[in-house]
């Protein structure tokens, strides 16, 4: 399955909620109507969605939020299921600990896709070592930074400025002047923003 490269707003409309796939420079609600599905007949309501359909939609939504493909997502779920604790919460923690997501949460990229590109283009270091694998798991205490040669990129400066205005998660500490941040701890469920019902995903894979 190839990575989706079409209109990002269309995906958010399909899920009926902002998936934060677009930059925060302009509210997605100003760009499109989230309460109507994409397409000519988007306003027409269909038949009642089955339990399976609801669970599948939730999985698709989370995959799109984090930019993860099906095979990767299955691996994350298997790992979450293997660990002790709440499987759904652990799944989200694994996704939040991805390097591309941490770069996004620290404000170095205006979207996860942009953050993923920064990682792939070797603009990011973890503990002083260049990292270019977006799925790399970041651990508590790791220092994530922008490489010197990338610090003057306008998109990074602008993204960081917007992130500072909007506030950053409590589980990261960012020094904007140094273009670096510390992953303080794996976020608790209450710290993970987003309209996500992870229990539906657990139910789907438990079938």
From Swiss-Prot:
Entries under CDD domains matching the protein = S4 (cd00165)
Record's GO cellular component terms = small ribosomal subunit
Going by the UniProt record, its keywords in alphabetical order are: Ribonucleoprotein, Ribosomal protein, RNA-binding, rRNA-binding
> What does the record list as GO biological process?
ribosomal small subunit biogenesis; translation
Give residue ranges for domain S4 RNA-binding.
97-160
Pfam families noted in UniProt: Ribosomal_S4, S4
- Molecular function in Gene Ontology: rRNA binding; structural constituent of ribosome
Per its UniProt record, what InterPro entries does this chain match? Ribosomal_uS4, Ribosomal_uS4_bac-type, Ribosomal_uS4_CS, Ribosomal_uS4_N, S4_RNA-bd, S4_RNA-bd_sf
Query: Which residues lie in coiled coils?
Result: none
For this chain, the family text in UniProt reads: Belongs to the universal ribosomal protein uS4 family.
What does the subunit section of this Swiss-Prot or TrEMBL entry state? Part of the 30S ribosomal subunit. Contacts protein S5. The interaction surface between S4 and S5 is involved in control of translational fidelity.
Q: What does this protein do?
A: One of the primary rRNA binding proteins, it binds directly to 16S rRNA where it nucleates assembly of the body of the 30S subunit.
Q: What is this protein called?
A: Small ribosomal subunit protein uS4
């Amino acid at each position: 399955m190839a990575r989706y490269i079409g209109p990002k707003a269309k995906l958010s409309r399909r899920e009926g909620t902002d998936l934060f796939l677009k930059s925060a420079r302009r509210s997605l609600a100003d760009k499109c109507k989230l309460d109507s599905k994409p397409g000519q007949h988007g306003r027409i309501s269909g038949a009642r969605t089955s339990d399976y359909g609801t669970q599948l939609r939730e999985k698709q939504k989370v995959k799109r939020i984090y930019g993860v493909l099906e095979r990767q997502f299955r691996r994350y779920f298997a790992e979450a299921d293997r660990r002790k604790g709440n499987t759904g919460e652990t799944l989200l923690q694994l996704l939040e600990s991805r390097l591309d997501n941490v770069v996004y949460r620290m404000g170095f990229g205006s979207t996860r896709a942009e953050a993923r590109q920064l990682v792939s283009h070797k603009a990011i270091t973890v503990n002083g070592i260049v990292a270019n694998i977006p799925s790399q798991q970041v651990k508590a205490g790791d220092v994530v930074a922008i490489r010197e040669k990338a610090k003057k990129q306008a998109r990074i400066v602008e993204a960081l400025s917007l992130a500072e205005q909007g506030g950053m998660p409590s589980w990261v500490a960012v020094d904007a002047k140094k273009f670096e941040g510390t992953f303080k701890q794996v976020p608790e469920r209450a710290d993970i923003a987003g309209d996500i019902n992870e229990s539906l995903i657990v139910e789907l894979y438990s079938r």
